[in-house]
Amino acid sequence: RKNKNFDRPPDEYKPTFRGMINSIPIELNIDSILIQNSAITYSELGVNKSKSGSIDITDINASIAGVTNMPQQQQRVGKALMKMEALLVGQSRLTTMLSIPYDKDAFSMSVNTTAMDLVKLNPTTKPLAGVDIISGQLHKIDFQMEGSENRANNTLIFDYQNLDLKIISDKGEKKGRKK
């Protein structure tokens, strides 16, 4: 759960995934982890909001492999790899892949979804953004990220149709409609 009513801490250097793994103070060598039939509800309280927005991810099946901070093992496995399939808000198939090579401070990630009724996102968008989704059909989301210590290159395809929104004022009344 995240509360955005607190001041943001000052920006500080944050290591890459490889840096985080390598900073673990004990020798670590995890061959694989399997996660089966799990669920997560992520909630966030927006700035000056009294109600949290949340999103449910269910039917999570994931594998994590090759997590190690031991140089000889890093050389042997080459990279840490995470693959996940899940169900987003009970409708959309969510597929995520994260690859962390051990020979450079970089990573690649992809996130893909299938079709869903966008109204299902209202428990997130109403409390956090003051947006009421009246109607809309998502065909797919394709997100690709290549990141390094200093930069990231991203591609996002958000394929939808017939999106109809209402903006909600801070007092809860409907302000205007956007199509």
What residue spans do the PLM features occupy?
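Outer-membrane beta-barrel translocator domains and adjoining extracellular loop/strand segments
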Residues: 3, 48, 169-171
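Transmembrane beta-strands of outer-membrane beta-barrel pores
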Residues: 39, 59, 115, 160-162
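Short beta-strands and strand-coil junctions in structured, solvent-facing domains, enriched
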Residues: 41-43, 71, 118, 130, ...
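Extended terminal
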Residues: 99-101, 112, 129-179
